[in-house]
């Protein structure tokens, strides 16, 4: 009986707690209306930018995608990185969002699968289902939040 309980506990620990989310939301004193998403050509998660744009749109914030050279013309920018891992098929394993205004960071969000998800079958969920809650926490103080 003790072995069975030990095995069940080990499985529960392997599956639970696999995702880590850290968010420093944008202050309520900052109202965002338009944000430039600085394109990161190193990111190969094909649906990441569309998910990001949808998330900002949910909070009534317009976005445009710009290259690094065009970012200086923007008042507020968001930079991002996203990594994928493989286990039978690719999945999002890490992402970071940083919001900037006048060279100062005004928000930060990180999604991370600890141990690349281990046995957690949720690791194969889509980018949208993983990032929507993270974006919503980041922008919780904004119009749509």
Segments the model singles out, each with a brief description of its role:
Residues 89-115:
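Amphipathic beta-strand/beta-sheet edge segments enriched in Tyr/Trp
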Residues 19-28, 53-57, 108, 112-145:
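C-terminal/domain-edge helix-coil "capping" segments
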Residues 40, 68, 81, 111-112:
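Active-site-proximal beta-strand/loop segments in catalytic clefts of secreted hydrolases
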Residues 41-49, 88-90, 120-131:
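Solvent-exposed, acidic/flexible segments
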Residues 65-84, 90, 96:
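A short, hydrophobic beta-strand-centered structural micro-motif
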Residues 36, 65, 107-108:
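Structural recognition of the beta-strand scaffold that forms the well-ordered cores
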Residues 33, 59, 76, 93-95, ...:
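Envelope-exposed proteins and targeting segments
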Residues 2-10, 14-62, 143-145:
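A structural "domain/chain start" motif
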């Amino acid at each position: 009986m003790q072995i069975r309980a030990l095995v069940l506990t080990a499985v529960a620990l392997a599956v639970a707690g696999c995702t880590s989310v850290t968010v420093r939301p944008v202050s309520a004193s900052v109202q965002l209306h338009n944000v430039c998403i600085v394109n990161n050509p190193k990111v190969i998660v094909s649906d990441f930018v569309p998910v990001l744009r949808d998330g900002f749109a949910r909070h009534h914030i317009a976005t445009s995608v710009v290259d690094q050279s065009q970012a200086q013309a923007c008042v507020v920018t968001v930079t991002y990185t996203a990594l994928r891992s493989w286990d039978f098929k690719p999945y999002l394993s890490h992402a970071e969002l940083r919001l900037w205004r006048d060279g100062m960071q005004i928000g930060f969000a990180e999604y991370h699968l600890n141990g690349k998800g281990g046995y957690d079958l949720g690791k194969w969920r889509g980018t949208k289902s993983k990032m929507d809650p993270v974006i919503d926490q980041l922008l919780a103080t904004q119009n749509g939040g």
